[in-house]
Amino acid sequence: MKIGDVEVRDDVFNVKVKKHVLWEVVKWQLAKRRQGTHSTKTRGEVAYSGRKILPQKGTGNARHGERGVNIFVGGGVAHGPKPRDYEYPLPKKVRKLGLKMALSDKAQNDAIMFVDNIDLGEQPKTKKAVEFLKNLGVDKETLLIVIPEKNEVLYKSFRNLQNVRVLLPEGLNVYDVLWANKLVIHKECLDRIYKKVEA
């Protein structure tokens, strides 16, 4: 299969796309991201005495024990959230298949571009980044740019653009690929992308 003038592997850029696999991988990614620091106090943790607030009989009021139970305002919460880890395992095969399918989806919709060079000079400039995207004709698109090596100038030039994310090939993931309308990939990244979906 060819994308522009670049020959790419069919087993990575032209596999059958199954939405359910993509959904599984995205769900797993978002679950891993969750902080899970939510917390509520139970009746044992709220700052109230455990004494009985009124006599059992004789007052005409309903029967009550302590003040910290969940039926009172300011009392504890019954079955409320506690800090927890939302991460769960997903087989590596499924993760790799998901990435292949995400890349294939973009390739089949002509949403991948390969470039020889992404050079924005010595100093980070958002203006230069916008010019670079305009020259490619993708300045209005939501973009994922894959670069071959860490480059502070590129990171800083693009980071002020809300519709652009910059990743190394090793950081390529299903969520970000699907988030973008178009992928701009440096040609030198291709072998490392193959390595990622095989490793």
From Swiss-Prot:
Species of the source: Aquifex pyrophilus
Gene Ontology BP annotations: translation
UniProt-recorded Gene Ontology molecular function terms: rRNA binding; structural constituent of ribosome
Name of encoding gene: rplD
Lineage: Bacteria, Pseudomonadati, Aquificota, Aquificia, Aquificales
Pfam families: Ribosomal_L4
Free-text function comment from the UniProt entry: One of the primary rRNA binding proteins, this protein initially binds near the 5'-end of the 23S rRNA. It is important during the early stages of 50S assembly. It makes multiple contacts with different domains of the 23S rRNA in the assembled 50S subunit and ribosome. Forms part of the polypeptide exit tunnel.
Keyword terms: Ribonucleoprotein, Ribosomal protein, RNA-binding, rRNA-binding
Family: Belongs to the universal ribosomal protein uL4 family.
GO-annotated cellular components: ribonucleoprotein complex; ribosome
Protein name: Large ribosomal subunit protein uL4
Subunit structure: Part of the 50S ribosomal subunit.
